[in-house]
């Protein structure tokens, strides 16, 4: 069963509120062979993602202005239901994409083969007025394979966060294809420990002069 916290919209901790409002862009190439059903594969990806959102609540959230914050520019997490977290782009037609999967693989997956403007849904830094989903995914179907790109909002997570989201998503996709057995549930501590960072404990003054080990000047 998903954690009881999975249905709750998380409150951002101070460190997250201070994080850069940009996106980390990741690329995941997957070999599929010459004849595959793009619609079937995309259906599994989309259904698996919706199931993953039930287990990792932030995955289905976006950043919106926190009107109750004392500081300007602060965001809060808002669960949306009117935005497609993942979209499909079919690049198998002649001239749509300049490489086959076999070409990219043979060359060692060179960075030049992955055109960010074509393969990703957004740039690193959002433009004014753009929505700010925690994850913006695109499934790019090319001859012989699939290139999944993920743009992850840095305010809502770090490398561990993204790994957990992707691990959960992958597990749900496998289950849709017949995998059985217990789920690798996200520990409750991932949710409950956040509360410990919301306010000072009062046990420490938090003065810089009390921490000489972190006051190096180079």
PLM regions and their residue ranges:
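Flexible, P/S/T/G-rich "lid" or insertion loops adjacent to the active sites of thioester-utilizing
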Residues: 204-218
